[in-house]
């Protein structure tokens, strides 16, 4: 306990320190960047990495960014997606990102919840849930403005991806509720391939698979005839049982274990069999928690619906085995655990190794919300603009879920589905509602800012400036 208290004290001293010399940079940064910690509760401490805008940091918007999991690091966004520097394959150097979002805004990347990345619990207890995570993220946001008061009145945006589809709306709603006590110039929130509705994600995944030629026609016809009374479009596949559940299980098993890349249907999986991405495990545990338990479901198929089985298994503590090594994160792991890098970003020597995702966080995380509808409605009602963007080749959190979710919110539609363009080419499609924009990113998977960087830079720039896409 004495060591833990000393560690907490040491971290408090390092809060907000500027990064003076980041190892491996192949360019001279024209912006300030910081790495530090926020004590967000009696026992939880969150690590953050803050990059000021390259443009006008005294005036430009401020973005708080959260990756998902639950249990995966937001530094994936920094070093793989939209940060000013991107990790090279050698795991030692960083190259400049031409489409870094800090060319138009200052960005704060928060590793959340405690136990993720370099965030930790002073007593070792990292048990958390959706409400506690949003509360501690809110505390981190408030502490940021205390640490950097010059940004207090900047236009502020809360953004994230994947299970950030829960983190971001719950945090944004909490900021809305706290405006009287702690005013923030909150202008908008944005989600990338956000996990916004559990049942919709299951239903639309099957339809997505059929629409992309992944399901045998005979199986599809059987599913429609025997399980959906001839109308599969309105069929609730989460409630099917018996042989119908078996059909749906077989489809999901192929999507996750059939050799395809769930993050991007048309992107190859990493060919190195020794690479077993932790992000795959956490996606399986987070947004498709039963994918590793088909045999057990088959034995109990007459006793439970698919949805109930998914829900039960999402609360299971059993370890998962991920057999699809689609994403290679070794360069980030090597870089973030480099002793010189740790020293440069002020990581205490007695903190453990950094990892892209935390098994312990994911297996102990308690999911409370399966539908973000009430949160999004509250946010829009309070005049906070919402952007939902989806790469249209992602199978983990597919665009059809986001599209149906947006349409079912009950907001007035102001523009029907219409192409939007970048560089005179169709970059995706947009549907506009009062206070909310739903857009797709053509040819992008789960990490759209990484795989369609120019298009995403433009889309986010337009959103920040409140300009039409």
UniProtKB/Swiss-Prot annotation:
Residues with attached carbohydrate: 125, 300, 312, 328
Q: Which UniProt keywords apply?
A: Carboxypeptidase, Glycoprotein, Hydrolase, Protease, Signal
Under PROSITE patterns, the record lists:
CARBOXYPEPT_SER_HIS, CARBOXYPEPT_SER_SER
Q: What is its EC number?
A: 3.4.16.-
**Which residues catalyse the reaction?**
162, 394, 446
Which SUPFAM superfamilies does the entry mention? Answer: alpha/beta-Hydrolases
For the protein in the UniProt heading, the enzyme class is: hydrolase
| Residues making up the signal peptide according to the UniProt record | 1-16
GO biological process annotations for this chain's record? proteolysis
Pfam families, alphabetically? Peptidase_S10 (PF00450)
Q: Which GO terms describe its molecular function?
A: serine-type carboxypeptidase activity
Q: Its family? A: Belongs to the peptidase S10 family.
- What this protein is called in its record is Serine carboxypeptidase ctsa-1.1
Q: Which organism is it from?
A: Caenorhabditis elegans
This chain is encoded by the gene named ctsa-1.1
